[in-house]
Amino acid sequence: MEKQVDVLIIGAGISGIGLAVHLSKNCPQRKFEILERRESFGGTWDLFRYPGIRSDSDMSTFGFNFKPWAKDKVLASGAEIKGYLSDVISENQLKDKIHFGHRVLSANYDSTKKKWLVEIEDNNKKKQTWSANFVMGCTGYYNYDQGYAPKFPKQEDFKGQFIHPQHWPENLDYTGKKVVIIGSGATAITLVPSMVKGGAGHVTMLQRSPTYIATIPSIDFIYEKTRKFMSEETAYKFTRARNIGMQRGIYALAQKYPKTVRRLLLKGIELQLKGKVDMKHFTPSYNPWDQRLCVVPDGDLFKALREGQASVETDQIEKFTANGIQLKSGKHLEADIVISATGLEIQILGGVQGSIDGKPMNTSQHMLYQGVMVSDVPNMAMIIGYINASWTLKVDIAADYICRLINHMDKNGFDEVIAHADPSQRENDTIMGKMSSGYIARAADVMPKQGKQAPWKITNNYLADRKELKDAKFNDGVLEFHKRGEQTANRKPKLVS
């Protein structure tokens, strides 16, 4: 028998849990359920188990607006974040709303019934169909089954362990081992000091090109001080507002004065290295925030490099050998373990094939209305967090907008909403904008497209988005509402090419 729900949330990570709380508080009349393919909640924070896994943005802004992160630790570990999410689930009675081990295979919108028919498979390979008025994509934007794994020349000759961080072996013993980490992004710069601390013999970070890295304190001393003469709530609000402003300010400065921000970042790195490491390894060729700015707590990466427990090589791989990696410069890196921290493989909606009346959708041909609603697709929203600020900031304001939209529809007796796009608004860039990171560049045929102007342009500006989504009117000429039984004219879903 077909199970029916009002709102079906795909994914029980940060986005799905956040949306569920907002729905329970603001749309109590609506029944919702969460489908999660894994056996636990948390998304990223359940999947990644490598040493040192942590947030890369401050927890005062990474925490939900309805549950303060009331600690002075700036960056939290994966386990701490999952514990925080566990508390959110318990405090909001969400446990029975989450269906673990349920993979969504496909979702087809029936324009006559004004409902989504969603095919699901559980871990026992048993299939079932659910129907839903709304489908909410809260799956993040990468493939949980595999990361980006380029094939290196002669990789099969290597006799040691070859590991991708997305599939970290349980109880891996790297004590005294020579470790080479390929990559220079957030994962690599987290792994290096963590594996040094964990007893690795030596850790080498092998990169093709440098990344901008900023040092931040591990403890928020200002928050620590303000709590002594302010209430807990006031101190938290002050800290959150300050950090939101700092995030936005640094990004805006980098866009307007890239040379100045570059000079400041490089000076900060130089002070950390203290002449012990050549600055060429930390001097990128691109401008700050053309790729995501990485952060390290208390300069832990630079400390490991200064003390000789770790090293960095900027070079290209010629081939693997039985006991390491031969570089094009002629240098050979000996390794017992090689870790390929080479990035993510982008995937939208968790790989779910969407369709409208049986006609397949191609997400790369759609835009996002107000950064939330999928263009020309009825009753579907997608929550994708910020690339230049804490992910959760977008979750909160997007979820609040979705709740307002649903309540507007209920008040007026509508069953369907469609954000009709003007094709001339569609840019070639994806919703990630001008970001040049490798994993984003590889996703051009998967990611929704950027729009030229509001309400289709993704600004990645939390302060502007918060005001826009809070004040947004639903009778703007873009959103079209229908009741069951009405014919929907001229809908042309984008076919898979």
UniProtKB/Swiss-Prot annotation:
InterPro entries: FAD-binding_MO (IPR051820), FAD/NAD-bd_sf (IPR036188), Flavin_mOase-like (IPR020946). One of its GO terms (molecular function) is N,N-dimethylaniline monooxygenase activity. SUPFAM superfamilies: FAD/NAD(P)-binding domain. Disruption phenotype: Cells lacking this gene can no longer utilize n-alkanes with C chain lengths of 32 and 36, but can still grow with C24, C20, C16 alkanes or acetate as a sole carbon source. Its EC number is 1.14.13.-. GO terms for biological process: alkane catabolic process. NADP(+) binds at R54, S55, D56, S184, G185, A186, T187, A188, I189, T190, R208, S209, R292, L293. Pathway: Hydrocarbon metabolism; alkane degradation. GO terms for cellular component: plasma membrane. Its cofactor is FAD. FAD binds at S15, E36, D56, F62, V104, V395. Binds 1 FAD per subunit. The keyword Phosphoprotein does not apply. It is a single-pass membrane protein. It is found in: Cell membrane. Is involved in the degradation of n-alkanes with C chain lengths of 32 and longer. Allows Acinetobacter sp. strain DSM 17874 to grow on long-chain n-alkanes such as dotriacontane (C32H66) or hexatriacontane (C36H74) as a sole carbon source. This is Probable FAD-binding monooxygenase AlmA.
